[in-house]
Amino acid sequence: MSSEKKALIEYWKATGLVTNEKVLKAIEKVPRENFVLPKYKEFAYLDEPLPLFSEQTISQPTTVAIMTDALEVKPGQKVLEIGTGSGYQAAILSELVGPKGKIITIERIKKLVDFARKNLKNYKNVKIIHADGTKGYLREAPYDRIIVTASASELPNTLFAQLKEKGIMVIPLEDHLFKITKIKGNPMYKDLGLFLFVPLLKGKV
């Protein structure tokens, strides 16, 4: 493990931002440098977002860690991710659900789909779909967990409908990140603080 990566993990522990050892081990295991563009490899463990294609970014490591921690993923679960990007978040989720779990990840930008497929070729429990993420993926629903890596103006009902009862969704709404638990069919919100994300867009390109 690089000194920069170790320093990040120690920072999360010391500040209490992320304390779940399983999450920390999954992040430790997945090499972020394999999910950034080649010219940014040396910056892989800077705690900031890095450019990808089509004005998209790979989220900063602390944001990924906080979202993953909030999702409370367990082995064997089925997780829907909206916004594959380079595949980094999906790789971490793959480690957490294990061989009996499944990650369905949707990306609207074809260039990113191709990049993520190359990056995730050794993650056999990850299925990448080129589609409009705002519609979710009904074929595999319902999901134990849903994570959205782009900001919506309000809770997308189509996605929430695909979440199991007592399931958890982590999603940015406007400029705040929320952990939403489905209780008796209704959303229970927990505000995780101020975060900046690219917008959640319809359609595919």
Segments (PLM) and residue ranges:
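Generic structural signal for secondary-structure transition and capping sites
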Residues: 32-35, 125, 168, 197
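Cytosolic histidine kinase catalytic core of two-component systems
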Residues: 21-22, 62, 111
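N-terminal auxiliary segments of SAM/dcSAM-dependent transferases
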Residues: 1-39, 204
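Short clusters of hydrophobic/aromatic residues that line enzyme substrate/ligand-binding pockets
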Residues: 35-36, 45, 50-52, 97, ...
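Conserved SAM-binding loop and adjacent beta-strand
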Residues: 17-18, 33-40, 50-68, 72-73
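Conserved nucleotide-cofactor-binding alpha/beta core module
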Residues: 72-186
